[in-house]
Amino acid sequence: MNIVILAAGTGKRMRSALPKVLHPLAGRPLLSHVIATARTLQPSRLVVVVGHGAEQVQTAVAAPDVQFAVQAEQLGTGHAVRQALPLLDPAQPTLVLYGDVPLTRASTLRRLVDAAREGSYGILTVTLDDPTGYGRIVRDAAGFVTRIVEQKDASPEQLKIAEINTGIIVTPTGQLAMWLGALKNENAQGEYYLTDVVELAIEAGFDVVTSQPDDEWETLGVNSKAQLAELERIHQRTIADALLVDGVTLADPARVDVRGTLRCGRDVSIDVNCVFEGNVTLADNVTIGPNCVIRNASVGAGTRIDAFTHIDGAELGANTVIGPYARLRPGAQLADEAHVGNFVEVKNAVIGHGSKANHLTYIGDADIGARVNIGAGTITCNYDGANKFRTVIEDDVFVGSDTQLVAPVRVGRGVTIAAGTTIWKDVAEGVLALNEKTQTAKSGYVRPVKKKS
């Protein structure tokens, strides 16, 4: 089967320099959603028709299995499909999709293709409570489709028809090429409409078959930011419903956003206003507090992530405790039972089994062993203005508050570092490391008194 995706429109109502089909839905371009669905049908040819912002669109979705046809002039949907004909296999049927209609299920498209398998002309239709503005499907007394009539051309009786044309079709490619060549642009816009092909098919004696989606929102398109926001909420609720079916506890299904792939184990609990981006895996018994952002991360079983935590490109072992207000950046690796607390930032660092950094700390480019305690205000000074260096802290080290470790430096096993110490040389195992300082107490000191105005 050939699949053609129309993605050449300007999208004026989006009021954006970004081509309409590249606006994101759940973190991916609209067009990427359509291409992903098309791939599940395993087409022999997959062609995207580009026009407005063609180079930008091609760059965004380029892949070995995707070919591009260019519609240099915006002369309608029929004209757009015509540009794809040289890239299609004439012996296979062609399914036409739209780059701004992202939520059509693959199962819906399979039903349409199956309905038209005997060489018929297939149309995906939908029945709406309010069909205003859409082309109506006109049938004869026997129920056969006779034509599609646009809103402006419909009679009062036809305006009562609730079944509308979605624009998604499947048809034999050879006949499609012939019908496209016969299209006329005798309309106010001077465009060639793909919807006009159905009458040519009927005139040629073709059976016109229809199929409908399970949900009408599958056929909704995006022409404005308001419609984009509407589809975002529909899509997110669909994802949330699937998570609930899988046993995930969501404090409020309307307040979780998945912008990628979220895999959850058993007894996972997610509080409100959490965002998951890229590929995220949550193992069994993970608890996510409110207002967290987690991107491209794996979280081990029994882990608790408290409120307002940001995690990006990190790996967390089992039974770790993160946050609140913690930030794990790319390359952060936490072993089982590690703790990273409030206002702690970890980047490109390994934190060993049972080690804790509970307050106000920066750990960057570091290797921290097991059972290490990192006191509040500790900083690994990893950057000299030109290059970055690593800090190594071996097992069972106690780091006092307000410590600076100037990399490259190694702290041996069992070391105790006194509060307020700057470490710039390697420290041998088992010692107390401190910078000796003099504490002075002066009697007779009088605090300044605020002057009266």
From Swiss-Prot:
GO terms for molecular function: glucosamine-1-phosphate N-acetyltransferase activity; magnesium ion binding; UDP-N-acetylglucosamine diphosphorylase activity. Pathway: Nucleotide-sugar biosynthesis; UDP-N-acetyl-alpha-D-glucosamine biosynthesis; N-acetyl-alpha-D-glucosamine 1-phosphate from alpha-D-glucosamine 6-phosphate (route II): step 2/2; Nucleotide-sugar biosynthesis; UDP-N-acetyl-alpha-D-glucosamine biosynthesis; UDP-N-acetyl-alpha-D-glucosamine from N-acetyl-alpha-D-glucosamine 1-phosphate: step 1/1; Bacterial outer membrane biogenesis; LPS lipid A biosynthesis. It is an enzyme of class 2 (transferase). It comes from the Bacteria. One of its GO terms (biological process) is peptidoglycan biosynthetic process. Mg(2+) binds at residues 100, 223. Residues 247-453 are annotated as: N-acetyltransferase. GO terms for cellular component: cytoplasm; membrane. Its cofactor is Mg(2+). Homotrimer. This is Bifunctional protein GlmU. The gene is glmU.
